[in-house]
């Protein structure tokens, strides 16, 4: 009997378990949380109460139970545990530890970009001593960030030496590494491109633009969507270098994304990569947009089913008429969650998927996501209508009765981008 072990519950865990079960695979979920707190356990055939940090105990249990596949949802910690367990047990991982390293060390990733002349933001060397001559050589404004964290954790934007000193110390306090990146602050539009990999070949699934609500922090991307301009330019001018980079990294199977900015100098710059599914869960609406099922792809890889180039979808070459969207539910307030409203109602809409991260009683931090809603539509107007419906319906309230979720309302801007993208196709 094939047995798949899912490490914890995070984005996409339930969907991966359900798909594995549809193949007749016996599914197990493990962590030290009750099923009500680790909901993938509620859909699995079996669950264990072993913390995913306890690798030795998990290895022993996997051998005893003859586990044949190990995977996880969107959790970098659990992905690293899966890599280690698969290595010990001789099981299949979609990526190697060596390739995964470039997702976790932004400094080494930038060094690899330099090696192949891929465009990246200018770096400034700052030692832990924070010497004045080093600080004086910096061209402000800059971004300061840890090499090993994602999701905007530990990041600061600095306009002078005093801010840089504090930001450097803050980044160190957040990180397990003593390496800190100080680089030119890019200003402009942001994207990430998602790729599928099969036996060493890579194919661009989609270029995803990232939009923040005006007046809120620019890194709180409330709407991530295939609605974009500059798509043909990216596909023709930037994508070949990115594919070269991913092959240099060692991306052979699975899913990988690479983040970019188009700076004020009208040049694209690579920011970072993630050898995993994206936190905005754009892989969910790709199934409707492209006919490509990321969940199926990753579960099959974990089960040892090999893919080849013929199974990859045709790469994107221009802006899509149809849309795929991931709405990340960012907060602009903090507090204890007292009430969740509208999640079930929105989930009943055809093609809409809802991933909720919080339950009543949980703490919500300011400027952190509390959930994701994804969908695909045939037209821009349908996309805008769903976003408006989410704004009206979905609420995450704190102890003061305040809705903590940022709403996206800049539809005129989105429509202009959509029209420009399609015009560029001509």
Regions found by a protein language model. Name each.
Residues 237-257, 264, 274-334:
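Active-site "cap" helix and flanking loop/linker of ATP-utilizing ligase/carboxylase catalytic domains
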Residues 56-57, 131-133, 164-165, 334-340, ...:
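Short, conserved charged micro-motifs
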Residues 155-268, 277:
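Internal nucleotide-binding/catalytic subdomain
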Residues 329-359:
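Glycine-rich active-site loop/lid that clamps phosphate-bearing ligands
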Residues 159, 195, 329-333, 373-379:
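Short beta-strand-to-loop capping motifs
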Residues 1-99, 305-306, 313, 331, ...:
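ATP-binding N-terminal substructure of ATP-dependent carboxylate-amine bond-forming enzymes
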């Amino acid at each position: 009997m094939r047995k798949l072990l899912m490490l914890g519950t995070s984005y996409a865990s339930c969907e991966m378990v359900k798909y594995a079960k549809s193949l007749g695979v016996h599914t197990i979920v493990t962590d030290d949380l009750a099923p009500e707190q680790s909901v993938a356990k509620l859909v699995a055939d079996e669950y264990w109460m072993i913390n995913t940090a306890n690798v030795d105990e998990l290895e022993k249990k996997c051998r005893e139970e003859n586990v044949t596949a190990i995977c996880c949802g969107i959790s970098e910690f659990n992905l690293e545990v899966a890599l280690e367990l698969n290595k010990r047990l001789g099981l299949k991982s979609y990526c190697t530890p060596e390739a995964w390293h470039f997702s976790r060390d932004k400094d080494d990733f930038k060094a690899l970009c330099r090696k192949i002349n891929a465009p990246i933001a200018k770096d400034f060397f700052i030692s832990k001593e924070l010497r004045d001559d080093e600080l004086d050589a910096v061209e402000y404004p800059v971004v300061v960030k840890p090499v090993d964290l994602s999701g905007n954790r530990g990041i600061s934007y600095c306009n002078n030496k005093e801010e840089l000193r504090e930001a450097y110390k803050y980044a160190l306090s957040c990180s397990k590494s003593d390496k800190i990146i100080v680089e030119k602050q890019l200003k402009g539009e942001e994207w990430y491109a998602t790729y599928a990999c099969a036996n060493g070949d890579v194919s661009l699934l989609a270029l995803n633009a990232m939009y923040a609500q005006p007046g809120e922090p620019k890194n709180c991307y409330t709407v991530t969507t295939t609605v974009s301009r500059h798509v043909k330019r990216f596909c023709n001018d930037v994508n070949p270098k990115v594919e070269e980079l991913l092959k240099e990294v060692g991306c052979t199977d699975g899913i990988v994304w690479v983040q970019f900015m188009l700076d004020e100098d009208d040049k694209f710059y690579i920011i970072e990569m993630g050898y995993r599914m994206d936190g905005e869960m754009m892989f969910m609406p790709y199934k409707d947009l492209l006919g490509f099922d990321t969940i199926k792809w990753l579960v099959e890889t974990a089960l040892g089913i090999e893919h080849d180039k013929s199974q990859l979808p045709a790469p994107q070459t221009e802006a899509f008429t149809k849309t795929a969207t991931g709405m990340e539910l960012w907060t602009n307030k903090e507090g204890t969650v007292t009430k969740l409203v509208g999640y079930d109602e929105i989930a009943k809409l055809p093609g809409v998927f809802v991933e909720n991260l919080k339950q009543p009683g949980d703490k919500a931090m300011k400027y952190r996501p509390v959930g994701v809603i994804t969908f695909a539509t045939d037209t821009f107007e349908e996309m805008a209508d769903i976003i408006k419906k989410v704004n009206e319906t979905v609420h995450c309230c704190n102890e003061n009765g305040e809705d903590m979720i940022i709403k996206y309302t800049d539809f005129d801007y989105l429509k202009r981008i959509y029209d420009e993208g399609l015009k560029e196709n001509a």
